[in-house]
């Protein structure tokens, strides 16, 4: 049995000029034990102008969070440049390369997925989701954005995570939703 702490399911959306990111609170030890129900995996950083969320190994995610925050400071809040620099360092550093986590970062203009393989991806539709319940949240969010455009970014983010929590055993209903 794998004995690491994992944190899962983050959803982010740009919709009708607003942005929101939601994450659940569950931290799982290995594949069988829920160790925490109220982890905070979505945060406002860089003077409240950037939202960041993580999924994956908790310790690894915190390491990446710190590196990303440092890059934001270094590049005066330039989200894209900071994400690219973190991805380059993550991929090329022998120690960082072993980190098992993913980040979603966003500001009012950009929404980016940052992965350990050096990927920095900006979605065409303004929606991203990661973690074990990510595909469920992504499907729910896309359907809501398309079929219920009157909903706010926050409402879509919350509903997408609630749907993922109803389906995925590694996602709970203790949600944090942040907006810009």
UniProtKB/Swiss-Prot annotation:
Regulation: Allosterically activated by HslU binding.
SUPFAM superfamilies (alphabetical): N-terminal nucleophile aminohydrolases (Ntn hydrolases) (SSF56235)
InterPro entries: ATP-dep_Prtase_HsIV_su (IPR022281), Ntn_hydrolases_N (IPR029055), Proteasome_sua/b (IPR001353), Proteasome_suB-type (IPR023333)
Catalyzed reactions per annotation: ATP-dependent cleavage of peptide bonds with broad specificity
Gene Ontology BP terms: proteolysis involved in protein catabolic process
GO (cellular component) term, any one: HslUV protease complex
GO MF term set: metal ion binding; threonine-type endopeptidase activity
Active site: 8
Binding residues for Na(+): 165, 168, 171
Keyword tags: Allosteric enzyme, Cytoplasm, Hydrolase, Metal-binding, Protease, Sodium, Threonine protease
EC number: 3.4.25.2
Cellular location(s): Cytoplasm
Main location class: cytoplasm
Reported function: Protease subunit of a proteasome-like degradation complex believed to be a general protein degrading machinery.
Subunit: A double ring-shaped homohexamer of HslV is capped on each side by a ring-shaped HslU homohexamer. The assembly of the HslU/HslV complex is dependent on binding of ATP.
Family from the record: Belongs to the peptidase T1B family. HslV subfamily.
Name this protein carries in UniProt: ATP-dependent protease subunit HslV
Organism name: Halalkalibacterium halodurans (strain ATCC BAA-125 / DSM 18197 / FERM 7344 / JCM 9153 / C-125)
Phylogenetic lineage: Bacteria, Bacillati, Bacillota, Bacilli, Bacillales
């Amino acid at each position: 049995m794998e004995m690491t702490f994992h944190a899962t399911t983050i959803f982010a959306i740009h919709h009708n000029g607003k942005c929101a990111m939601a994450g659940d609170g569950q931290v799982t030890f290995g594949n069988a034990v829920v160790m925490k129900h109220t982890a905070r995996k979505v945060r406002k950083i860089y003077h409240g102008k950037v939202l960041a969320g993580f999924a994956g190994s908790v310790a690894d995610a915190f390491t990446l969070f710190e590196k990303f925050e440092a890059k934001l400071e270094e590049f005066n809040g330039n989200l894209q440049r900071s994400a690219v620099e973190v991805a380059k360092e993550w991929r090329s550093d022998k120690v960082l390369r072993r980190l098992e986590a993913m980040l979603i970062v966003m500001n009012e203009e950009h929404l980016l997925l940052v992965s350990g393989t050096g990927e920095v991806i900006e979605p065409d539709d303004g929606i991203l989701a990661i973690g074990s319940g990510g595909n469920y949240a992504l499907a729910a969010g896309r359907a809501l954005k398309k079929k219920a455009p009157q909903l706010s970014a926050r409402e879509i983010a919350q509903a997408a995570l609630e749907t993922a929590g109803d389906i995925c055993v590694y996602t709970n209903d203790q949600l944090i939703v942040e907006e810009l």
